[in-house]
Each structure stands twice: as structure tokens, then as C-alpha cells.
């Protein structure tokens, strides 16, 4: 009977091994398309299925089920992914502006050339009503196009500010969730288990990856398996089972984000007011989406400032040469424009900045306006009329507009070159990180990814193991029946 017991025990151990293998293979196949899933590998060995010295022989048993994972590759992958996310956010935020630079229908080049061409036409025939009307229309088109470009850039900047709020909120939620996972990881080790469950570790890595994408913090793993999150300056965001909190630093009357994140403790019943720990700077200490948005907002502000300077230079170049003289219409009346309060101010240039109906708070909107609503508002002369005198049209006024062409177009070209160069640098940065990301993704896939062809082979292997051990148990049952029949029972 000891022999029958041995055969039965060996077969049963083999069946259990096959069942575990089939279950693990099924889990791998199911998790193949799940983000953050790591392949489980079965490590079998041939050993005695029991410690009973009466049982002889060996069977295939499971030594361990191992989660395929590399801490080094994971850390490298997340570190590069945070940089890739930052550069991608930068480039994507600037896509609209980049398109405007190459699209003549929304860019400045065509309308600026149109303005100076109409200036030249008017200088050639300053008394022509049609030339004066065309010049007035061209000046309005140029002012509107500059405003449109400035407004578009400012809108992308405001959108970046809004996304900073969202990212800070999401990062706080993910950090708290990761701290809770760390508690479970720590608890599982406390109960004498050699390792936490593979599913729990997958969740840990998934949460860590999301934090790296949002704020680009560095992920470090403790000996217990906890994931710690630290910024580039060493400031902790998640330290074991404790998660800190991020708050956007703001400034000015408009309460706009500055790109700095304040790190504080979590509010508690005992201490409802969070205690400040330190701060981190977006784009320097904080990468990921937040870093990209911070860098873009800073660049957009610089673009707007330089575009504003271009407008100021253009205003100066197309203003009256003699501060004491007044621009007058054909009848000799001073040219004026009306303000919102009903008062009037002299027209002293082809363009002006309209700030009467707006409040500029921590923003740099450009409200450039043309002084010429129609051809009749284009200055005829700068000389004062009297009752007995009349004066011919003053050609020098329009000639001063024409003379400003080279300086203005050069300023615009320099602006385009600077902005295009910066966006091009971001694109090259993004391409560089994409290449590294592809290599690290391939490496991580080799270590922890699921190969469906390999799993199909494993499935067949464990099916055959199941069938073979099933046959062993059937043989034991038949032998038992024969022995029973021989003994007359």
C-alpha cells in the first residue's frame, strides 16, 4: 500500500502544480493589455511532494511564483518618462503658436507687408481718396492681427495656469493613494510574508508612474518594497507611509500661479492648518506635466513682452515727428479720437494702445488700435490753417511711415526667429527623450512584458503536465482496485 500512496501523492502534487501553472498563465494573458502589469513566472523543480520518509520518488512542484521586475530599469524608465512628459507638454502647448508662425492667413508677415505697401502707395499719391482708404484699412488689419496673435499666446498661457491647478490636485490624490499602498506593502511584510503580493506591487508601480508623469519626481524603492517620491532638490513628496501636500504659490491681485509648489504637511484634526516644509520650482525641481507648463508659461510671457515691444517700436516709428504740431484733416481741423468718458485726445500716431476699457493685472494683453477708422481720419497736414490760407497735403507724414518698414519688419523677423528657435529646441528635446523612452520601454517589456506566444507554449506545457499526472492518479486507482479484488474485498 505504501507504493500506491507514493504514486497517488506524486500524481496529486503534479496536478496541483499544473493547476497553479494554468492559473498563472491565464493571469498573464489577462494582464497583457493592462497598464502596469508585470509578468508572473513560475519556477518549478522536481522534489519529493511530502516529508513522509515512507514516500519515495519525486514530482514537479512549484518552488516560487516570481514577479518579473527590475528596480533599475523601472527607475530609469520613470525618470526619462518624466522628462519626456515635460518636453511633450512644452511642445504641445506651443503647437497653436507654432502653426500661426507658418500660416500666412493668421501670421503678421502678409498684413505687415500690406500695411507698408499701402503706405508706399499713399506716399506716391497722398491726396488719393482710394489710397487713403486702403491705408486706413491696412492699419486696422495690422493692429487686429497683432492683437489676435497676442490674445492667442495669452490664452495658451492662461490654459497652462489652469492645468497647473489640476495637476497639483491630482498629484495630491495620487500621493495619498501611494502612501496607502505603502501601508499595505509594509503590513504584508509584517505578517512574515517574504514579499507583498504581485498585484499590490503592480499597483505601487502604477501609482508611482502616474506621479512621475504629473510632477516628475524621482521614485526610490525601500528594502521593504515601499515607493518613496522625492523631487530633484531632495524634498520628499511621499516618504514611506506619509504623503505630503502640494500647494500652488500665487502672486499678484489676479492670484496667478508662479510655477512654485509649496510642500506642506497634510491637515489633521490636531493640526488643521498645514505646516510648510519647503518649496520646489517647476521646470527645475519639478518635471513632468507641471514642469512643462511652468516653462511654457514663462516663455509665453517673454514672447508677449517682446511682441509688446515690437508694437511700441512700431507706434514710435509711425507717430508724428514734431511733438508740438497737430495732425489735421483736409479742412484743417485737428484729428482726435473719443474716449469712453466722452473726452477727446489728439491723434499723434498711426497706432495707440487702448487701456481705457481694461484693467491690466499680472497679465500682458496687447490692445493695439489703429487711429484711422476711415480714409478721412488719415492726416492731411501738420500745419495750422487760417481763414485765408489753404495748404497742400503733407507728403512727409506718410513718408515717415514708409521709412519705418525695415526696422519694423526686422523686429518681426527677429521675434519669429526667437520663438521658432525656442519651439524647435523643445521639439528636438522631445525627440531625444522619445528615443530613450523607446529603448527603455523595449527593455522593460523584455523583463516584465507578456509574450503571448510564450504564454501559449506554457499553456500547452501545463496542460500536458496536468494530463500526465492525471494518468498517474488513474493508474494508482486501477492498481488499488486490482489489489482489492485479489484480496476478495
Where do the model's predicted regions map?
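Structural signature of extracellular appendage/secretion-system components
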Residues: 1-489
